[in-house]
Swiss-Prot record:
UniProt name for this protein: Translation factor GUF1 homolog, mitochondrial
One GO process term, biological-process aspect: translation
InterPro entries found in the cross-reference section: EF-4, EFG_III/V, EFG_V-like, LepA_C_sf, LepA_CTD, LepA_IV, P-loop_NTPase, Small_GTP-bd
Catalyzed reactions per annotation: GTP + H2O = GDP + phosphate + H(+)
SUPFAM superfamilies attached to this UniProt entry: EF-G C-terminal domain-like (SSF54980), P-loop containing nucleoside triphosphate hydrolases (SSF52540), Translation proteins (SSF50447)
Coiled-coil ranges (or none): none
Organism (species): Leishmania braziliensis
Pfam assignment, any one: LepA_C
Places the protein is found: Mitochondrion inner membrane
Keywords associated with the record: GTP-binding, Hydrolase, Membrane, Mitochondrion, Mitochondrion inner membrane, Nucleotide-binding, Protein biosynthesis, Transit peptide
Length: 831
């Protein structure tokens, strides 16, 4: 009977053991410990050395071997193990029950310099790149990515087998409430092939499926060599399935076709139809597809085997990257000089960041199952090789990196290529399945680093982290053990140190710059300072780098922020995260799409000559504008055939849609594509599709282009004061309709006062709609019961003159409750 054990820097052991075992732990000094286990079949001792002190069990090993060889009744198994990423030794012994009487207290001796060097190198060689696999799980919305990822973690004994499914990798509260994946989450799994005994490190990245979070998917694919393309066996290939397939194909990844929810299949014909559809759409061979079910655990083992067999290992140069990672040696020693020559400049891709406040990493650490032993034919589960738990909240930023070349350890001084600034790494580790610190991250690994002094201004997602070499060092294609033909045209690393201390590092190709397509103003709730909202948005933007932010100043609502998003769901999720994670209740203005304009005598078809225009920087044609441009998208709707007629009628008549393609997928489903203004899609087409199809239809949009449009800016004036929060950009022929809705909403919700409140909608200087909120009037003639009518007229005239004086004093002064503004803003999105 064997057990795996680990020891971290504080001397805490994280063990997975049989239920029959009883254990006792004894500490020896700082960070050193020995653990003895006893069972009904005998006693076994596992000994550990702590990190940082250079200890070994040199004196203990001869005692054990001498006793075990002298005992004829003992079964001896001596197997030193170096746990990956931990500065420790783990030794396993199966010895008789009375062995503890002869062992006594182990004598801990310092390692020799040669042993220290060998031990440091073992950190690098414990997981060679050939035994690492990085895989992203991609699919359409609700095709079972998160549920399957959870099943894979439970199969690997990282999560309890009897726990709730489909919840662990969805760490954010908004993800759990909406039932969708918003943030890509990473988890490292250790697997051991039973036939060869080779241990593999598999990094799984669970990605979102909605188009609004495609930026999360693209970043995850950049850190992977393979992609598991999931398809719901009942739903088949859908719009976002193809989008994810092309994204993985663009990154030249190995794509593994996987069918999910096999437990819901009624007959084999349904499976064959989906496999044929997948092969026709993507070209992936149907015989290579893995049939899985997270509910019944079908195909999980086969999927792991496919990942190990078919996904290529990462490429890059392994080795130490910093002199601090080397053991202490004499500065003039030949061995030190030789190790300096073998230094490999660090290159790591930063593809995600978070703070302690804006991540779900502290939520629900998984409890270890009772037994780590998993019995299956070809792949046996690995064990936790790093201790850890829930991270404590602290100042700083966590970064998720993929190490391309070299090694990063705590204390490594890394340089951010984008800003050129240096920052020290305080902690490194893997996510297994929560944050577990390790001693190093080597080439090919995916893990986290913690920077205690880093701020949002210093972070650029997609940046390259590197180390400055201490000598002139150039690494080019073909100099490593990997042939140049396999590396392609991209150099592995290039780092040169000139006499002027300047350096050049070949940056890792980052991510495409994303441009927001939806903008909205965020204003703090009544009684909340703008600084609190700004700080919360800053922290959240660390975890969501696709959001843009600008300062706003509204005379009615006060200071606020204009935020840009990748879609409408993205905006709603961001608002919910502000409330759930930071307690910030905000008033959100109606979403506006990004309009453009070109100056006179400029080509509207040239993207370089387009300039953004909004209500805050609006320019009229007489101010040099040649043409306004409106964003159009291709909306793809996949709907049950019985709902197609109603959806098509609404798209053509109410949302300015133009049908481009209609295709019958099968007997029950129809796919249709429309060319549609993004503004109309924002004003309710998505809701119309969902309500008309009772939630069965799906809608995705992409292919953003700009076309000429006759746009105007419409302002709302209350008591001769412009309300900038209600200003909007719309088509000229729709201005009257939008104005009437807003003015009527204001008239219904505004409280009457002692003076009349004129409500006006203006396009330029022209009033297109006007209403008046009548004032309260006191009955000044209540005490006049008889006499000449002129007595009453005199009172009425005096009252009228008094109200005119009050109106002159109150011009431009109006106080609006946020509920009134919210109702008016809701009227702008009504159809």
């Amino acid at each position: 009977m064997k057990r795996h054990g680990v020891c971290n820097t504080s001397g805490v052991a994280l063990t997975r053991y049989s239920e029959r075992l009883r254990f006792r732990t004894t500490h020896y000094g700082n960070g050193n410990m020995a653990t003895s286990h006893q069972s009904c079949c005998g006693r076994r001792l596992d000994f550990y050395t702590g990190p940082g002190k250079g200890w070994c069990f040199t004196s203990l090993l001869p005692v054990l071997r001498r006793y075990c060889s002298a005992s004829s009744s003992s079964t001896t198994a001596v197997a030193p193990v170096q746990a990956h990423g931990e500065d420790l030794y783990v030794s396993h012994y199966a010895i008789p029950e009375d062995a503890h009487r002869l062992v006594g207290t182990p004598q801990l001796l310092p390692r020799s310099p040669a042993e220290e060097v060998a031990f440091k190198k073992s950190l690098i060689k414990s997981f060679p790149q050939a035994c690492i696999r990085n895989v992203s799980v991609v699919a359409h919305v609700d095709h079972g990515k998160t549920t399957l990822a959870d099943a894979m973690l439970r199969f690997s004994n990282l999560l309890p087998a009897d726990g709730a499914t489909g919840t662990f990798t969805d760490r954010l509260q908004v993800e759990k409430e909406r039932g969708i994946t918003i943030k890509a989450q990473t988890c490292s799994v250790l697997l051991t092939l039973r036939e060869t005994g080779t241990q593999y490190l598999v990094n799984l990245i669970d990605t979102p499926g909605h188009v609004d979070f495609q930026y999360e998917v693209s970043r995850s694919l950049r850190a992977s060599e393979g992609a598991a393309l999931l398809v719901d066996v009942r739903q088949g290939v859908e719009a976002q399935t193809m989008a994810q397939f092309y994204a993985a194909l663009e990154q030249n990844l190995t794509i593994l076709p996987v069918l999910t929810k096999m437990d819901s299949v009624m007959n084999d014909a349904e499976v064959e139809k989906t496999l044929l559809q997948l092969e026709d759409s993507t070209g992936l061979l149907s015989r290579e597809a893995v049939l899985t079910s997270a509910k019944s655990k079908q195909g999980i083992e086969q999927l792991f085997q496919h990942i190990i067999d078919k996904v290529p290992p990462p490429r890059g140069r392994a080795g130490f990257s910093d002199m601090k990672q080397l053991p202490i040696m004499h500065a003039d020693s030949a061995e030190r000089k030789q190790m300096e020559k073998e230094l490999v400049p660090l290159r790591a891709l930063l593809f995600d960041c978070w703070t302690a406040e804006s991540s779900g990493m502290t939520d629900g650490a998984a409890s270890a199952p009772a037994s780590a032993a998993t019995s299956f034919s070809s792949v046996s589960s690995g064990t936790v090789t790093a201790s850890g738990g829930q991270p404590v909240a602290r100042e700083g930023i966590y970064g998720l990196i993929r190490v391309m070349d070299g090694t990063v350890t705590p204390g490594t001084m890394v340089t951010f290529c984008h800003s050129g600034k240096k920052h020290e790494v305080r902690e490194v580790g893997i996510i297994h399945p929560t944050l577990h610190p390790t001693a190093a991250l080597t080439a090919g690994m995916v893990g986290f680093v913690f920077f205690p002094g880093l701020t949002k201004r210093d972070v650029f997602i997609g940046d390259t982290l590197c180390t400055l070499p201490t000598r002139k060092h150039t690494v080019r294609v073909g100099v490593s053990n990997i042939p140049a033909a396999e590396l392609g045209t991209e150099p592995t690393a290039t780092a040169e140190l000139a006499s002027s201390d300047s350096f050049a590092v070949e940056p890792i190709p980052g991510f495409k710059t994303v441009h927001p397509v939806v903008f909205a103003g965020f204003y703090p709730d009544e009684g909340v300072y703008i600084t609190q909202l700004r700080d919360a948005v800053d922290l959240l933007c660390v975890n969501d780098p696709s959001v843009t932010m600008e300062q706003l100043q509204c005379p009615t609502l006060g200071p606020g922020l204009q935020l840009g998003f990748l879609g409408f769901l993205h905006m709603q999720v961001f608002k919910e995260r502000l409330l759930m994670e930071f307690g910030q209740t905000v008033l959100v203005t109606p979403p506006q799409v990004q309009y453009m304009y070109v100056e006179q005598h400029c080509d509207p078809g040239d993207p370089a000559q387009r300039k953004p225009v909004s209500v805050s920087n609006w320019r009229w044609p007489h101010e040099g504008v040649g043409a306004y441009l409106e964003p159009f998208v291709t909306a793809t709707v996949l709907t049950p055939t019985q709902y197609f007629s109603e959806i098509n009628s609404a798209a053509l008549s109410s949302f300015r849609g133009e049908m481009q393609e209609m295709r019958v997928i099968d007997d029950a489903r129809t796919l249709v594509r429309y060319r549609m203004p993004l503004a109309d899609l924002a004003r309710g087409f998505f809701s119309t599709v969902k309500s008309s199809s009772h939630g069965y239809a799906t809608l995705e949009y992409d292919d953003l282009t700009y076309m000429a449009a006759d746009l105007v800016k419409m302002d709302i004036v209350i008591n001769k004061a412009r309300i900038s929060a209600l200003s909007t950009i719309c088509l000229r022929h729709e201005a009257n309709t939008h104005a009437r809705r807003i003015i009527c909403s204001l008239k219904e919700n505004l409280l009457r006062s002692s003076v009349d409140l004129p409500l006006q909608a203006l396009v330029g200087s022209k009033i297109i709609t006007r209403e008046t909120v009548k004032a309260y009037r006191k009955d000044v003639t209540a005490k006049i019961h008889a006499g000449d009518i002129s007595r009453k007229q005199k009172k009425w005239n005096d009252q009228k003159k008094g109200k005119e004086r009050m109106a002159r004093r109150s011009v431009g002064t109006v106080t609006l409750d946020q509920s009134v503004l919210a109702a008016a803003m809701g009227a702008t999105t009504a159809r």
